[in-house]
């Protein structure tokens, strides 16, 4: 009986020793782990970038401009929420439906746009960074508000548009409170054309749009930004 107890004890000690050894191989000491916790708190981000994309089939939509803005982010574990305000210095062409096809297009002229959005992001590394980096995917909903535009005899105005944008990005934390990030998104909005674009011009009798064409058109706009954030 004593022999059996001693044998069982030796087996148990061997199992425990093997388990501890395996655990030591799989895990990391905190000081040497590639994973580190992200500091909790709101993050104020200053962003700069460039927004391009399609001007639509007619060519009157705003595009090709530098952007600058601010964003406030709040993390909720692996998911984060954000609010953004951005000014875009864009430009657009003017198409005069009352001129012939060779002279009806002019520009480009400045057409500023303000973008407001709210979004959600999923942090792929959870509440931690991997070697200081935290990639994410997400999406934002918002509005784009057109500013003063050049005189347009067709009556076309960019106006206020609903926007949607999927996005991906990468955050780098060189310090506990400081972060640098790059973000790429594809902004979608819908242009609305005036009915004058379907009227034949008085010179060569050619309309801007065919009579069967739609007066609305979705356009896509790649938007790349870099930003610097501070966690409060």
Model-inferred region functions:
Residues 175-232:
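Predominantly the C-terminal beta-signal and adjacent terminal strand-loop region
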Residues 71-155, 159-162, 174, 221-232:
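Gram-negative (and chloroplast) outer-membrane scaffold detector with strong preference
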Residues 57-60, 155, 212-213:
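A short acidic/glycine-rich loop-to-helix N-cap element
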Residues 44-50, 83-89, 137-145, 170, ...:
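Transmembrane beta-barrel strands of outer-membrane/channel proteins
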Residues 61-65, 97-103, 153-158, 197-206:
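Flexible, surface-exposed loop regions and adjacent strand-edge segments
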Residues 1-38:
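Cleavable N-terminal export/targeting peptides
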């Amino acid at each position: 009986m004593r022999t059996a107890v001693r044998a069982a004890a030796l087996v148990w000690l061997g199992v425990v020793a093997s388990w501890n050894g395996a655990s030591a191989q799989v895990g990391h000491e905190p000081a040497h782990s590639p994973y580190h916790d992200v500091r909790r708190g709101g993050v104020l981000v200053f962003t700069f970038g460039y927004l391009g994309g399609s001007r639509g089939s007619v060519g009157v939509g705003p595009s090709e401009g530098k952007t600058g803005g601010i964003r406030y982010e709040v993390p909720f574990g692996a998911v984060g929420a954000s609010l953004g305000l951005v000014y875009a210095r864009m430009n657009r062409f003017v198409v005069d439906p009352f001129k012939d096809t060779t002279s009806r297009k002019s520009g480009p002229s400045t057409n500023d746009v303000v973008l407001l959005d709210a979004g959600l992001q999923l942090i792929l590394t959870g509440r931690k960074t991997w070697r200081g980096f935290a990639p994410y995917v997400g999406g934002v909903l918002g509005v784009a508000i057109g500013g003063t535009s050049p005189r347009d005899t067709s009556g076309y105005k960019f106006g206020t548009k609903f926007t949607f944008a999927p996005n991906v990005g990468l955050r780098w934390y060189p310090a506990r409170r400081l972060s640098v990030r790059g973000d790429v998104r594809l902004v979608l909005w819908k242009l609305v054309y005036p009915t004058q674009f379907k009227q034949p011009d008085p010179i060569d009798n050619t309309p801007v749009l065919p009579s069967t064409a739609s007066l609305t058109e979705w356009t896509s706009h790649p938007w790349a930004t870099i930003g610097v954030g501070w966690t409060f």
